């Protein structure tokens, strides 16, 4: 396990994003995660500042929709987070990989009805595949890499990570962030046999397409496949 000396929690967040290939972040800035914004400033990651959190979340949703990689969104606590829930819900319904980082009140103010405090595990459970809170800055590399894995594995969807403000400014030694390993999903042999049987016996077949990762090559390949069988195609 490699450590690189003491860094703030904000720096560790950005290092973990870079380790996982992030090149763009959408956000609405807020005081609760200023340490992350400071680290982003010289990171080389493009930071798109939005006027409203719902738009920032939907921008991240669109990135995930077009690339198959998790879109990254950052918002502040309380109303910032609840505004972002609209984009989170869309990503959940449409199976789009996305990670929403939310600034949170400092750890010693939790469960004390602090200003703009929200219990996100309860609030966002229906909107996300996983909702986690990073209480220990040393575990940031672990949490962020796990968020990427959860967002992209099985049925893709959004993940929420909350970031206590004091945790982000704490300086700690932490292991070097590692990239997640994408798990490719594809039909098995029996599923393909079933598909072939259904297609052969269908009286009026039609393909309905959806999901992510539709590259130019994938579109051309499916176009040739559908045309060879003379089957119409629709999109969800």
Label the model's feature ranges.
Residues 2-236:
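N-terminal alpha/beta PP-like core and its mobile active-site loop of ThDP/TPP-dependent enzymes
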């Amino acid at each position: 396990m490699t450590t690189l000396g003491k860094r703030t929690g904000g720096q560790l967040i950005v290092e973990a994003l870079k380790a996982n290939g992030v090149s763009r972040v959408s956000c609405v800035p807020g005081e609760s995660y200023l340490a992350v914004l400071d680290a982003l400033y010289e990171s080389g990651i493009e930071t798109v500042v939005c006027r409203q959190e719902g738009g920032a979340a939907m921008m991240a949703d669109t990135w995930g929709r077009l690339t198959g990689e998790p879109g990254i969104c950052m918002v502040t606590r309380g109303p910032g987070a609840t505004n972002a829930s609209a984009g989170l819900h869309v990503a959940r319904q449409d199976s789009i990989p996305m990670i929403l980082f939310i600034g949170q009140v400092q750890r010693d103010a939790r469960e004390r009805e602090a200003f703009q405090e929200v219990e996100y595990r309860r609030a966002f459970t229906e909107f996300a595949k996983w909702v986690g809170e990073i209480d220990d800055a040393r575990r940031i590399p672990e949490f962020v890499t796990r968020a990427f894995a959860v967002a992209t594995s099985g049925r893709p969807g959004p993940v929420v990570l909350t970031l206590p403000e004091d945790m982000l400014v704490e300086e700690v030694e932490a292991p070097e962030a590692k990239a997640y390993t994408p798990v490719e999903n594809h039909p098995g042999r029996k599923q393909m046999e079933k598909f072939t049987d259904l297609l052969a016996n269908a009286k009026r077949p039609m393909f309905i397409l959806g999901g992510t990762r539709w590259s130019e090559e994938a579109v051309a390949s499916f176009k040739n496949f559908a045309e060879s069988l003379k089957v119409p195609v629709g999109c969800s």
